[in-house]
Every structure is written in C-alpha cells, then in structure tokens.
Amino acid sequence: MNKVFGIVGWSGSGKTDLTTRIISYYSQKKIIVSSIKHTHHDFEIDKEGKDSQKHVRSGANEVILYNEKKWALISKLQQKSTSIYKILEKFEKKNQLILIEGLKHSKFPKLEVIRSSIKKPYIYKNDANIKAIVIDQEISDIKLSKLPIFKFSETENIGNFILEYFKR
C-alpha cells in the first residue's frame, strides 16, 4: 500500500490551507503526491444540467468524467459506507505519498492542526496516531506535549517531518 499520512483538526483550523501548501512543496520537490479530502457532507462534483449529471440522474451506477489529461469517477455502488482502504486502492502505485485531509479518527499516522481561537478538545490527547502538532500561535498547555510542534507557517519543516516519518 502507498504511504499515507493524515492532516486533522477541527473545522476552521486551517487543514486545507496547510494541506495545499504541503502538496505544493512536494510538487516542487518532484515528489509524486496525491490527496483525499474527507467530508461529512453530501457533495456533487457535477453541475446542474451537465451531461454527466444527466447520466447519474437517469440511473447510471457509475459515471466517469474523462479527457486525455484527467478523469473522475462518480459511484453509487457502495455498501452502507465505503472504507478508506477501498478508496486508497484506487490510487496509482507510483504515488510516493497520499495525504488525507480530515478523517480524524483514522488509524493512519497524522498531525493535528490547532488554531488557538477554536475552543475544542485537543485530538492528540486521546489519539496515539497523532505524530506532530501544528499551531497558529503559542499555546501554553500544548508545550507540555512530547510531540513535535510546528508553527503553521513552517510548511517545509512539516513536509520534511512527514517524509522523515516514513524513513523510520
């Protein structure tokens, strides 16, 4: 299986901003990286009136949007829920790393993004799979953690930490 690392935190913590900056950093280093964005909400990747949406609405169980440069699969063939492991099987083996944004209760190694203005429980305190913490500013009780702590702006250091994690 591909190397998988998660980026978790509460809504509004800055997960997407951090994830996209890490992806950009890896892309500049010619590291083949892909990502999964987990959401709790229903979503549509089609727009109203587009042909692919008409295929889905007419009853197609799976629709692939395709051109010579990219493709996307819309599938309604899942059981009650689709396991993240089934989704990971869809990725090409040539990926060197897959980042998962969200999915905070997964068993993958991950880091927690903490924004000081969000008053929610820290995930790392009850999750041994959290391997590092990313903060927007100094937070006194987080200093007591034995985990590595990065500032939100330290994209390169965070990216390198993730890469080094898999060399252990």
Predicted region positions:
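Walker A (P-loop) ATP-phosphate-binding motif of ABC ATPase nucleotide-binding domains
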Residues: 4
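Hydrophobic anchor at the beta1->P-loop junction of P-loop NTPases
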Residues: 7
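The conserved Walker
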Residues: 11
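N-terminal phosphate/diphosphate-binding loop that engages ATP/GTP or pyrophosphate donors
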Residues: 23-79
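Phosphate-binding/switch loop-helix module in NTP-utilizing enzymes
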Residues: 75-105
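Phosphate/Mg2+-binding loops and adjacent switch elements
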Residues: 97-151, 155-166
